[in-house]
Amino acid sequence: MKRTLQHIAVQGMLFASLVFSAFAQAAPPTNLKFCTGGVGGFYEGLGTSIGGKITNDIGNTLKVINTGGSVENAKRLKQGDCDIAIIQSDAVITQPMPASFKAVNAHEEVVYWLYPKGGEVDDFGDMEDDSVAKKYAFATVKGSGASVTLNNWIKTDKDYAGAVPVEFKDWYSAAEAVAQGFTMDSGVRVDIAGMLYIGRAGMLPADITSDFGGQILVGEVNDDSFANAKDANGNPLYTHCGIPKDKTSGLGRSNSISDQATYCLRAQVVFNNAYLNGLDEAETTLVRRAVDKGINSTVKVVR
């Protein structure tokens, strides 16, 4: 009798262990790692809101990761360092991405052309002219979404092939070069025409506006060729739009009469489907629904 009770007890423990093991394998990861953007920026706020709604439904913990922007986010997403990220739509199709992912359109972003007060190139399109391109370089921040757009535009319109980007480590350094109209590279002076910045309308970062607000102006982008760039589904990546006078974050404008002509594009929330690996059907359904609801209930407010 004693042996029978022991046998039953052992069987019960084995059964409980198997049940626990199956449950553990089916449970989602303990963390949801969300790659966003700079500290205090719009990407960080959006990621915190979306991620909070997802983890609240799943019952795990949100880990917000601050990054340098779209390029770094795409890299981290592919490497598995983050599970979900906010990335510019043109970076989604030009940067290496995970084998399987879901992308949802989020908010609209504006392409700002920023140039020095008193500068010659108040319109990005002027850099098509070889005589202008030979005199000036573009300032850009390494790894930023703006660097992706700049390179994509140069590839889209071969007339910009002579334009040279000069990379800076951050927006403050790039803004400083734009404000003074030049930078020194290996002891050689390089004149800077300006730089692109991409973000939510009216939300230029303090790195650009705080110390250099009186030295940098918002210019225009007048070139129809960029409307020809397409995404993987054949849809336009960039659409014509304007920057109203109250959306320059306090910077002066080259066009004092009407909105600044430029392009807009979408940011996307990108989810790595590898997050679902190892989950059973019920848990997969739960996580997918939480992700979809977390994204859509948030971005509908900011679209």
Segments the model singles out, each with a brief description of its role:
Residues 89-92, 119-120, 146-258:
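Pocket-lining segment of extracytoplasmic ligand-binding domains
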Residues 118-122, 128-137, 210-302:
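Extended ligand-binding regions for polar small-molecule ligands
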Residues 65-67, 139-141, 168, 219-221:
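Conserved beta-strand termini and adjacent loop/short-helix elements that scaffold enzyme active sites
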Residues 29-57, 115-180:
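Bilobed "Venus flytrap"/periplasmic-binding protein-like clamshell domains
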Residues 9-21:
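Bacterial N-terminal signal peptides
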